[in-house]
């Protein structure tokens, strides 16, 4: 399951689906979800807020092997990660860190197995 159907989420969803993975993409903005449907028609699309437990239950998160919280909002990504790990027992949870100052929060205590911080990755590559 991937939360956030912006550029990062929809590209990731498409790539994973093309590699044979079953992917559910959750997005709360209908306009953004419509773009994702065109970009990645081979994945399941769901309108909703991934910070809401009932949305994750409807997405059958308890059967997911991996969750990627890829929204542009760090708080939302942390809430989604924590719910995925604590409430639904997802084995592997990855989260996008949008603001480097928040990276210290993205730990196993918050349900995050691996945090991805694009600014730090780019800095490390220079």
Segments (PLM) and residue ranges:
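Cytosolic regulatory regions of ion transport systems
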Residues: 1-126
């Amino acid at each position: 399951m991937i939360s956030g159907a912006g550029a990062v989420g929809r590209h990731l969803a498409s790539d994973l689906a093309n590699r044979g993975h079953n992917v559910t993409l959750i997005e709360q903005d209908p306009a953004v979800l419509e773009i994702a449907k065109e970009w990645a028609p081979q994945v399941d699309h769901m309108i909703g807020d991934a910070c809401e437990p009932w949305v994750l239950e409807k997405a059958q998160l308890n059967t997911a092997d991996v969750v990627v919280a890829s929204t542009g909002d760090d708080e939302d990504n942390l809430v989604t990660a924590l719910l995925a790990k604590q409430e639904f027992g997802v084995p592997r949870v990855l989260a996008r860190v949008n603001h480097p100052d928040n990276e210290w929060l993205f730990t196993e205590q918050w349900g995050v197995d691996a945090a991805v911080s694009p600014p730090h990755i780019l800095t490390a590559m220079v």
